[in-house]
C-alpha cells in the first residue's frame, strides 16, 4: 500500500513538473508581439480599423481634428494613443484591540435530618459551580505603496456615451528578467489634458498591474509541489 501511494505521489509530481514550459530554458523570456497589449485577454495581436478621413471644409487649411493651434490633438477615436501618468503614494495603518472577560459562580446546598425508630441519620449535599472566560485579541496592519510610472495606452473602443476604453502594456527586459506594466480602464474624453495625458485617478474601472517573469521570479516562487501540498494539507 505504501509503495502504491509513493508511486502515485511521484506520478503527480512528474505531471505537475510537466506543466512547466521548457522552451525558455537557457534563454531570456520572450517579449509579447506589438499590439497584444490592446487586448490583454486575447491570444493574438489586436488589429485596428482603418482611420476615417476627417472632413475638411472647402477652402480651409485645417480639419476638425487638427484645429487646435496651441495644443496637441487629444485621443478621441479607436486607435489613438494617450499617455497615462501613474503616481501612487498610499499609506494605511490600522490597529485593533479587543478584550473580553466574564466570570460566574454558583453555590448550591442541601441539608436534611430523618429518624427511624432509634436510628437517626442526617444527609448533607453541597455543590459549587464556577465558570470563567477571557478573550484578548489585537491586530495591526501597516501598508505603504509608492509607484511612479508613465505608460502609453491605446483607445480600443468608443462607448455609446462617448467614453473611451483604453489598454496598454509596456515590457522591459533586463538580462533574464522581463518587467511588465499593464493598464486598462475607462476614460472620459473631458478628463484628457491638453498635452494628451491623463492621471490614473481619473480612470474608471482602472486595472493596473506591475510585475514580471523570468529567472528571478521563478526562484522567488515556491515549487509547484510545495504549492500543491500547502493547498491540500490540513496542517
From Swiss-Prot:
Give the family this protein belongs to, as stated in its UniProt record.
Belongs to the FlgH family.
Q: What membrane topology does the UniProt entry give?
A: Lipid-anchor
Mind telling me which residue stretches traverse the membrane in this protein? Answer: none
Read off the HAMAP family from this record.
FlgH (MF_00415)
Location in the cell reads: Cell outer membrane; Bacterial flagellum basal body
- Where is lipid attached as S-diacylglycerol cysteine? 19
Q: Which residues form the signal peptide?
A: 1-18
Q: How does it assemble?
A: The basal body constitutes a major portion of the flagellar organelle and consists of four rings (L,P,S, and M) mounted on a central rod.
Q: What does the UniProt record say this protein does?
A: Assembles around the rod to form the L-ring and probably protects the motor/basal body from shearing forces during rotation.
A Gene Ontology cellular component where this protein is annotated is: cell outer membrane
Asked if the record carries the keyword Membrane, the reply is yes
Q: Which GO terms describe its biological process?
A: bacterial-type flagellum-dependent cell motility
The name this protein goes by in its record: Flagellar L-ring protein
What keywords would UniProt list here? Answer: Bacterial flagellum, Cell outer membrane, Lipoprotein, Membrane, Palmitate, Signal
At which residues is a lipid of type N-palmitoyl cysteine covalently attached? 19
Q: Could you state a single Gene Ontology molecular function term?
A: cytoskeletal motor activity
Q: Is rRNA-binding given among the entry's keywords?
A: no
Amino acid at each position: 500500500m505504501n509503495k502504491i501511494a509513493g508511486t502515485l505521489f511521484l506520478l503527480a509530481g512528474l505531471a505537475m513538473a510537466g506543466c512547466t514550459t521548457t522552451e525558455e530554458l537557457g534563454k531570456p523570456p520572450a517579449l509579447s508581439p506589438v499590439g497584444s497589449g490592446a487586448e490583454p485577454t486575447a491570444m493574438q495581436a489586436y488589429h485596428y480599423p482603418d482611420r476615417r478621413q476627417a472632413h475638411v471644409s472647402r477652402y480651409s487649411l485645417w480639419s476638425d481634428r487638427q484645429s487646435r493651434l496651441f495644443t496637441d490633438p487629444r485621443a478621441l477615436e479607436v486607435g489613438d494613443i494617450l499617455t497615462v501618468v501613474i503616481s501612487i503614494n498610499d499609506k494605511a495603518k490600522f490597529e485593533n484591540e479587543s478584550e473580553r472577560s466574564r466570570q460566574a459562580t454558583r453555590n448550591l446546598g442541601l441539608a436534611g435530618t430523618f429518624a427511624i425508630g432509634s436510628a437517626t441519620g442526617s444527609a448533607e449535599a453541597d455543590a459549587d459551580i464556577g465558570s470563567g472566560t477571557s478573550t484578548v485579541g489585537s491586530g495591526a496592519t501597516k501598508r505603504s505603496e509608492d509607484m511612479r510610472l508613465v505608460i502609453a495606452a491605446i483607445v480600443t473602443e468608443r462607448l455609446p456615451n462617448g467614453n473611451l476604453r483604453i489598454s496598454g502594456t509596456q515590457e522591459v527586459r533586463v538580462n533574464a528578467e522581463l518587467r511588465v506594466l499593464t493598464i486598462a480602464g475607462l476614460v472620459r474624453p473631458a478628463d484628457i489634458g491638453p498635452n494628451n495625458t491623463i492621471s490614473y485617478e481619473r480612470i474608471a474601472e482602472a486595472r493596473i498591474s506591475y510585475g514580471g517573469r523570468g529567472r528571478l521570479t521563478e526562484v522567488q516562487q515556491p515549487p509547484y509541489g510545495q504549492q500543491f501540498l500547502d493547498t491540500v494539507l490540513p496542517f
